[in-house]
Each structure stands twice: as C-alpha cells, then as structure tokens.
C-alpha cells in the first residue's frame, strides 16, 4: 500500500469522525436547552457534550488537519496553487472556527450563561452540512 493511500484513508476516517461530532453536538445542545430546568438531564447532557467534544471531536479535528497536511506534503507544495485546494482549506478553517465556537457554547451551557435558544442550535447545525457538501463536490470534481 502506498503512503499516499494510507494517509488518504486515515484522513477520511478522521474527517468522518470529526463531521459526526460537528453534526451531533449542536443536537445535544438543543436537548440541553430544552431540558435546562431538569438538573439530572442537564448533568447527563453536560457529560455527553464534554466527552464528545474532548474525546472524539478534538482528536478527530487534529488528525484531520495532520493527515491533510501530510497529503499536501506528499503531493508537493505546488498543490497549494490549485484553487479547489485553497477553497477546501478555507472551508476547513471555517469548520475549525465553528468547532471552537461549539466549545464556547458548551462552556456557556455548563456555566448556565447560555443565551441561545434551541432553535438557534437547530439552525447552526446546518453549517457543517453545507460545508461538507461544498467540500465533497470541489474535491471530487476539482473544477479549478
């Protein structure tokens, strides 16, 4: 097996894991906000959020970046000249900012300082879906 295919496979596994977390964590926030007055439920949601964020999402994000950088290195630095790759990297930067924003939301929920509604979390839950669709199409078709 070539190194490129190995790292491409590892990159895909990490990205799928990261995306699963990015799609699921806001959904937990919805339930958390809707059950904010129930102490036992709140405690369960806080544990779920913390474990998902720290044990799955953060490592998956780091590995997605690491394996992606390795793939660029294997392909050669000149691959940075491809517009499709620049757009993909920009999209991944946006996903990373979104990831960190979810961490901020998680901390505000835990400290009872959250001002966001469950509807807000339902809406922002679509951000990674839109970016995922965009990334898949530009990577598969490499239009530019």
Model-derived features: positions:
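Polytopic transmembrane helical bundles with strong interfacial aromatic enrichment
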Residues: 1-144
């Amino acid at each position: 097996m070539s190194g490129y295919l190995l790292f491409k496979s590892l990159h895909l596994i990490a990205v799928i894991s990261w995306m699963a977390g990015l799609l699921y964590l806001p959904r937990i926030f919805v339930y958390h906000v809707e059950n904010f007055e129930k102490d036992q439920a709140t405690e369960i949601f806080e544990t779920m959020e913390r474990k998902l964020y720290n044990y799955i999402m953060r490592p998956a994000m780091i590995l997605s970046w690491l394996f992606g950088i390795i793939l660029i290195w294997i392909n050669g630095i000149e691959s940075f000249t491809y517009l499709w790759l620049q757009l993909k990297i920009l999209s991944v930067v946006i996903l990373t900012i979104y990831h960190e924003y979810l961490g901020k939301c998680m901390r505000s929920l835990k400290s009872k300082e959250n001002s966001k509604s469950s509807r807000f979390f339902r809406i922002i839950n679509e951000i990674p879906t839109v970016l995922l669709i965009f990334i898949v199409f530009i990577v598969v078709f490499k239009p530019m």
